[in-house]
From Swiss-Prot:
HAMAP family in the record: Rel_fac_1
Protein's UniProt name: Peptide chain release factor 1
The keyword Ribosomal protein is annotated on this UniProt entry: no
Function: Peptide chain release factor 1 directs the termination of translation in response to the peptide chain termination codons UAG and UAA.
PROSITE patterns: RF_PROK_I
Keywords, in A-Z order: Cytoplasm, Methylation, Protein biosynthesis
Record PTM text: Methylated by PrmC. Methylation increases the termination efficiency of RF1.
UniProt keyword Lipoprotein present: no
UniProt similarity note: Belongs to the prokaryotic/mitochondrial release factor family.
Source organism per UniProt: Prochlorococcus marinus (strain MIT 9515)
Length: 364
């Protein structure tokens, strides 16, 4: 992006920021909580960009002043050396700020700010795959709790040997999808299962789907397309067994999608949760169809996000996690403890690089 074009876009963003601040000071808006919250969010999103823009303008002025000072001190070698050193530092800062604001101005995925439904399914590997699915669920739970998101299982099919055949987790918070969308795909584990008497390393897999939550307005569901049954929720026996049919078994006939929801205490709550999951699944189908139409012949470097794509291998023997999209290795234990920031940040940087390259190609 040419520098003059960049500055023009930053000036537009700065004007929008000033306008939002004026709206926040408007008594009428102050008395409208929903509108106030919306405007405050928009202002918060723009503030870092505007601060960086102001710093860029200040740096430009310092560079101009230093160049003038250099002209005025041509005969003073010591002063010339100091000014050139300062100019070098200012140019480095300017280039860093240009890269930062350019990335901030790149087109954003409109779904990035949404909460998600995260679905984990045991893949190849039998009981060990189910146990691995449970390990992944705990990893995401720890990551979400560390950030301050609300993490809640809303549908689960447990395995007799531990873990889950399938699990759907609701993760609510700010910009959840922007972080977790890179987790979609096949997660492979290489380790010696607890049930392995010979000490042999087994390879198992689990599939992760990350579905941005959809509003009812975005996904229309015809009630006649639904087949809804009820069942008793499973329990640990004794007083914990649910004698009332609170579980919901929901089938969307056109797609064959089935959702079995048992986690809530009442049938109504389970039905609401089942509909949330169904909407997210149907929304994911809509997005995939739209992306397939728009996608160019070249696959995204960060990965297609396809749930059949192997994205990561967790090797317990070598205490190593390999992200195949990045071609990078990470320590295993911190990753499983929910410390995913390093790998997710690297995926974000890779995606931003790709978007910037595409943007520059289109500009040319």
């Amino acid at each position: 992006m040419e520098y003059t074009t960049l500055i023009a876009r930053l000036k537009t963003a700065s004007k929008s920021f000033v306008n939002l601040e004026m709206q926040l000071a408007d008594p009428d808006i102050a008395n409208n909580p929903k509108k106030l919250e919306l405007i405050a969010k928009e202002r918060a999103k723009l503030e870092p960009l505007v601060l960086d823009f102001n710093q860029l303008l200040d740096t430009d002025k310092e560079i101009d002043d230093s160049r003038q000072l250099l002209k005025d001190n041509r005969n003073d070698k010591d002063m010339e050396l100091l000014i050139n050193e300062e100019l070098c530092n200012l140019e480095v800062l300017k280039n860093s700020l240009i890269q930062k604001v350019t990335i901030a101005l790149l087109p954003k995925d409109p779904r990035d700010e949404r909460s998600v439904m995260l679905e984990i399914r045991a893949g190849a590997g039998g009981n060990e795959a189910c146990i691995w699915a449970g390990d992944l669920a705990r990893m995401y739970e720890r990551y979400g709790q560390k950030i301050g998101w609300s993490v809640k299982p809303i549908s689960a099919s447990e395995s007799d040997m531990g873990g889950f055949k399938e699990l759907v987790i609701s993760i609510k918070g700010d910009s959840v999808y922007s972080q977790l969308k890179f987790e979609a795909g096949v997660h492979r584990v290489q380790r010696v299962p607890a049930t392995e008497s010979q000490g042999r390393v087994h390879t198992s897999t689990a599939t992760v789907a990350v579905m941005p939550e959809a509003d009812p307005v975005e996904v229309k569901i015809d009630p006649s397309d639904l087949e809804i049954g009820t069942a008793r929720s499973g329990g640990a026996g004794g007083q914990n067994v649910n004698k009332v049919e609170t579980a919901i078994d929901l089938i969307h006939k056109p797609t064959g999608i089935r959702v079995f929801c048992t986690q809530e205490r009442s049938q109504l709550q389970n039905r609401e949760r089942a509909m949330e999951i169904l909407r997210a699944k149907l929304y994911e189908i809509q997005l995939k169809e739209a992306n397939d139409k728009e996608r160019s012949q070249r696959l995204m470097q960060v990965g297609t996000g396809d749930r059949s794509e192997k994205i990561r291998t967790y090797n317990f023997k070598d205490n190593r996690t390999t992200d195949h999209r990045l071609g990078s290795n990470f320590a295993l234990e911190p990753i499983l403890a929910g410390q995913l920031d390093e790998v997710i940040d690297a995926c974000i940087a890779q995606e931003q690089k790709r978007i910037m390259e595409d943007f520059n190609e289109n500009e040319n």
